[in-house]
């Protein structure tokens, strides 16, 4: 099961306590997975389709609890490779559908006319609890979250721009920074920052998903830190080895052309130790000198040796 499915299963187990929050959550679910059919004699029907069994069960429970409606339930198997099951809830009673749509503020009556409301009615989200319930319903109906091992991405897919913008504004009312983009015939409201996704999961009540995502974030951060340290140490080691090889080359050139006795005693001592112990650090070489010399002192002497070697090479060229 995917991380997204696990998150939906967790959220679908949260059942709102008060009627207002139930209405808000159901309104969001209908917005995301519902379709309304109008036909002769002012008749209405409502169809809700989802591939998640937990979401179907929750939606059924909300409809029955709030409106005493028991939707007809159908299950269809997909035709393609995965052959996923689709759960369909169908309400055919016109009065029940009208009651549902009017109370969820999807259908408004104005001067005797019925009008669809494509945005989020402010009355549905007038309290913090109702806002959280709406976001939970929107995620259950049309949300998804990427596996945090691969990427940080949470999104809601809606079929109406006005609803997408209202949903983004609702998310951002919690000091988040969601964006809206068009994708084919839909609109996607999304978050891409791990910290903001964690905050939204907390707002919706998906605490297990939140903890799992945080664990992955911490692990990835630790892994990245270790990689940075290893890369830094590797770079430093490469730099040290290259410097040692360069120093030994200079010492051997002096030895071959004029002999190490050409060097002052302090430089000759360092030269002999460097050739004998090519893997030692400057600090370790310094401790072996009599008297001991610090890292900067050893570095200074080795630089002097390289300068002498370079001058000898220049003379030879001349």
UniProtKB/Swiss-Prot annotation:
User: GO biological process annotations for this chain's record?
Assistant: cell division; regulation of sporulation
Q: What is this protein called?
A: Probable cell division protein WhiA
Say yes or no: keyword Cell cycle present.
Answer: yes
* HAMAP family attached to this UniProt entry: HTH_type_WhiA (MF_01420)
Query: Does the keyword Nucleotide-binding feature in the UniProt annotation?
Result: no
| Feature: DNA-binding region | 281-314
The gene it comes from is whiA
The record's section on InterPro entries has: Homing_endonucl, Sporu_reg_WhiA_N_dom, Sporulation_regulator_WhiA, Sporulation_regulator_WhiA_C, WhiA_LAGLIDADG_dom
What Gene Ontology molecular function terms does this protein carry? DNA binding
Disulfide bond annotation, renumbered to this chain: none
* Record-stated family: Belongs to the WhiA family.
Entry keywords, A to Z: Cell cycle, Cell division, DNA-binding
- Biological role: Involved in cell division and chromosome segregation.
Alphabetical list of SUPFAM superfamilies matching this protein: Homing endonucleases
Gene3D superfamilies attached here? Homing endonucleases
The source's superkingdom equals: Bacteria
